[in-house]
Amino acid sequence: MASKGLPLYLATLLTGLLECIGFAGVLFGWTSLLFVFKAENYFSEPCEQDCLLQSNVTGPSDLKAQDEKFSLIFTLASFMNNFMTFPTGYIFDRFKTTVARLIAIFFYTCATIIIAFTSANTAMLLFLAMPMLAVGGILFLITNLQIGNLFGKHRSTIITLYNGAFDSSSAVFLVIKLLYEQGISLRSSFIFMSVCSVWHIARTFLLMPKGHIPYPLPPNYSYGLCSRFGASKKENKAAEHETKELRSKECLPPKEENSGPEQQQQQEQQQQQQQQQEQHEQHSFRRCALSRRFILHVVWLSIIQLWHYLFIGTLNSLLTKLSGGDKVEVSAYTNAFAITQFFGVLCAPWNGLLMDRLKQKYQKAAKRTGSSSEAVALCSMVPSLALTSLLSLGFALCASIPVMQLQYATFILQVVSRSFLYGCNAAFLTLAFPSEHFGKLFGLVMALSAIVSLLQFPLFKVSPESNAVYVSMGLAIFLTLVHPFLVYRECRAEKTKSSVDA
């Protein structure tokens, strides 16, 4: 990392962290916002009509139509949050950072303005606004993940930190709920969020690149405000060429790097030509997307994510059932859940630190054995993948026990496992596949997992009345341990191959 650009890099890092923690993943604070919507009588007409027909007989069934509408909104929004990542990931890869961020700002601003001016009479507009909010938020995250490239060996830590900040941003809706209870209207809160778009625009042009942040980072790399007053286009093109050279050198086995100057030059030229051909064949987007490694990762993410979405979407109904309809207790537990979400930003970096430390350890071993950098990266992912599956399994087991006080432990396991899940997902795609396909692969894995997430709505009709769904999800999560096991076998096979070649 160049010391000259350090202040700019830190400014980009910190403002990106603020953007993710304050805006990107607010959708997942749905439980807190739902409490406000219910207080404002959104979708309450069907319930009132049912109550009149039943001669003032009230109970959980009276609110089912209202809960189903809210569940459907969250299902659609969470689906769009994931599914639209594929086309937006393509836009990010094809049209670069500035265009992607301007699209994100447009969707996000429109969504917050629509929510600000909704009421009980226009509650149907939430079916439009919440998906738009989700799409804008995920695009903020995608464009910020590349900031990890500025910090070299700390790359995984930064990526997981940003994913943790994405998780923590769900606490924003808790703040809106608390402000609402103090007399500040929902409209005022969302108008303030709309005005913040000015800050997003300023950051886009001053602290973010027009294109992509390369990895490895070339010397004298500049972007944003500095590129407008410093480096020229020719210098930036030279930096891109230098990045390609650095990337090709990283792929060289250690024993070939130590040969004589003339032989090394010839070998490098030959190997660069071979690598370009091999990378085109072996690392094409189609080849990556159809690989067993990618397919297993999609299954791993889809199952665990479905459980998280189902839990968030049904939490209000679950708490109402366990508390016997006590609104004060439901509010207290809703606040507790939202507060735990904020600590996702503190949990996620531990996963990144684990990956970075293991990667450094395996790199030292690779210098002795001649293992490829790809094998080293995969080895560093195995413990994180396994730990994420185990945490999610514990979360599912706690949630399946119908004891109100135990839900505090459930909330803690939920936030830790969720922050590990998305950090692990982004880091795995970054380390296990070529960086030029990251946007498309990240989008594809989220789009495919989004299709699976649509199951949460039919499951919602079962879960409040039965624990069978929780038990089934627990068994499915247990099976996700197959993914880290097969990645481990792949690493072992690569190590064996390297030792035989040596």
Curated annotation (Swiss-Prot):
Provide the catalytic activity annotation: adenine(out) = adenine(in); guanine(out) = guanine(in); hypoxanthine(out) = hypoxanthine(in)
One GO cellular component assignment for this chain's record is: basolateral plasma membrane
* Disulfide bond annotation, renumbered to this chain: none
**Low complexity bias (residue ranges):** 262-277
Query: Key word Transport present in the record?
Result: yes
List where the protein spans the membrane. 17-37, 72-92, 97-117, 122-142, 156-176, 189-209, 294-314, 335-355, 381-401, 419-439, 442-462, 468-488
GO biological process terms, semicolon-separated: hypoxanthine transport
Q: How does it sit in the membrane?
A: Multi-pass membrane protein
Q: Where in the cell is it found?
A: Basolateral cell membrane
Task: Tell whether Transferase is among the UniProt keywords.
Answer: no
The text of the family note is: Belongs to the SLC43A transporter (TC 2.A.1.44) family.
| Physiological role | Sodium-independent purine-selective nucleobase transporter which mediates the equilibrative transport of extracellular purine nucleobases such as adenine, guanine and hypoxanthine. May regulate fatty acid (FA) transport in adipocytes, acting as a positive regulator of FA efflux and as a negative regulator of FA uptake.
Q: What is this protein called?
A: Equilibrative nucleobase transporter 1
Q: Which species is the source of this protein?
A: Mus musculus
From the broadest rank down, the organism's phylogenetic lineage runs:
Eukaryota, Metazoa, Chordata, Craniata, Vertebrata
